[in-house]
Amino acid sequence: MATRNNGKSKAAGSKSGGGHGVGPWLGLGVIWILLDQLTKIAILKTFAYGESRPITGFFNLVLAYNRGAAFSFLAAAGGWQRWFFTGLGVAAALFIVWLLKRHSGQKLFCFALALILGGALGNVIDRLVYGHVVDFLDFHLRGYHWPAFNVADCGICIGAVLLIIDELRRVRR
């Protein structure tokens, strides 16, 4: 069964109603990309590759390159991974834009997707421009270092956690 809304057909029970369309969510994604890219530019201008500067007892800024995916997965592959992960990031971004269009009224869901979109495209830009992802956030404890990451990765992780929270809330309703 379909209902009419401003002359557009919408499936009954659709959860996308309301909202201001996809524009604000795409805008948030662009803001996240800019934050990611500006921080990377600042690090690239002030650090030599491998240089590390302690900030606290558990956090350093460091310039590291990642030719693979999360945790340097496939970093040592023969170079094909650059294009594979670039294509994967573009495909994910297109799917996210489609989801944003379908569900623009679901605030938490779309906020999460916008962060993931910004993060995915931030890392795609790195792969296209540099041939690798620029990482610089280094957390450590008692000699163990979490793999270095960046603002784009933060967007992806925060977005993923928010998607889980959104789904848990939806299941409870």
Swiss-Prot record:
Record flagged with keyword Transmembrane helix: yes
Subcellular location: Cell inner membrane
Annotated active site: 135, 153
Keyword Repressor applies: no
Assigned keywords, A-Z: Aspartyl protease, Cell inner membrane, Cell membrane, Hydrolase, Membrane, Protease, Transmembrane, Transmembrane helix
Family statement: Belongs to the peptidase A8 family.
Classification via HAMAP family: LspA
Protein name (Swiss-Prot/TrEMBL): Lipoprotein signal peptidase
Lineage: Bacteria, Pseudomonadati, Pseudomonadota, Betaproteobacteria, Burkholderiales
Encoding gene per record: lspA
